């Protein structure tokens, strides 16, 4: 399942950027937001969808993965993971 950090790393590869400030500039956000992602916070749903589109990923699956990453409820996480797997195999 994709995570905020996975999305960030893939975006860095795609756009050939390496610094926090460069990534922030590509996304039009503050560099502290990107730094927070590197330190373990999750990105917003809107940005996750925007980055998924840039990367050519399934936006729905990406959004579900970010919601699971953010969730503190194990049952919720398991349900989301199951839905993601079902959609991948459909």
Label for each model-derived stretch:
Residues 1, 30, 86-89:
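Low-complexity intrinsically disordered segments
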Residues 1-22, 26, 60, 64, ...:
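A short, Lys/Arg-rich alpha-helix, primarily the initiator
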Residues 4, 48, 59-60, 76-77:
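Short amphipathic alpha-helical segments that mediate assembly, nucleic-acid/protein binding
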Residues 27-43:
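Recognition helix of helix-turn-helix/homeodomain-like DNA-binding domains
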Residues 28, 39, 56, 67-68:
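Short amphipathic alpha-helical surface patches that mediate protein-protein
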Residues 35-36, 49, 63:
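Key DNA-contacting residues within the recognition helix of helix-turn-helix
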Residues 40-54:
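Short, basic-rich loop-to-helix N-cap that marks the start of a DNA-contacting helix
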Residues 63-90:
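Short, charged recognition helix plus adjacent turn
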């Amino acid at each position: 399942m994709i995570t905020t950090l996975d999305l960030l790393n893939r975006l860095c590869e795609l756009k050939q950027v390496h610094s926090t400030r460069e990534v922030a500039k590509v996304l039009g956000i503050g560099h502290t937001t990107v730094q927070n992602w590197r330190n373990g916070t999750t990105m917003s749903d809107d940005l996750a969808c925007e980055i998924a589109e840039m990367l050519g990923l399934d936006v729905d699956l990406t959004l579900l993965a970010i919601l699971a990453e953010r969730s503190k409820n194990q049952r919720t996480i398991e349900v989301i993971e199951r839905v993601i797997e079902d959609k991948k195999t459909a």
